């Protein structure tokens, strides 16, 4: 994933955390975790706060990494933490998704989100959420969760909201594959693909959730001038530029060719489409 912080771009692969200069894209430094037995299973997601990068790892470990030096300063091995995924920060608390474990070669999906107090870097509590929690996002002091719950095949992945101001109450919102947020609005794509037919058939549904009014609007946030192929092309990314509200949607043709990026104004008016230069676009960061 990509993260913009301290006027730099932070990028993680499974084994490394890299930092790049914002303008030229020239790599400044990188940190490798392959020789650390606690972290060698792989970095999964990153978030930033107060000069530190917080990273989740397979194996149930969270690391506190100095954002300037990329040195690991603290590690927290979470009891009953297995393959950690998404992370998000709200009110000096780190929320960490605990997705699955393997037992006798079989996948066992979990339903935990861990809450880590960043002041003490200790586990504060464990929340019960939808099965296989994967993506976490903070907006307006709320935590939004997409859980890859495969029991909802026809409906899609489960979308929930965690409210730190209300004792971390967990509430179901609906279903979504991708989410992004700006100006009190969470933009959602529910991308459903039928893999049982050849070629596979995808159907995309675009909607929004108003954080202030706690309202899910099932009407599309795209205007009628949106390219028609967006309704049926597999999506791989949804991002919003918080400087101007522009919405970016990435699509993928998998191994068949390069993906595309579709750009829209905040009001859903189509602006442009361009080749992303590779397969499966999945992240974007924005600079003034």
Model-flagged regions — what are they?
Residues 1-288:
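Predominantly soluble domains enriched in secretory-pathway, periplasmic, or organellar proteins
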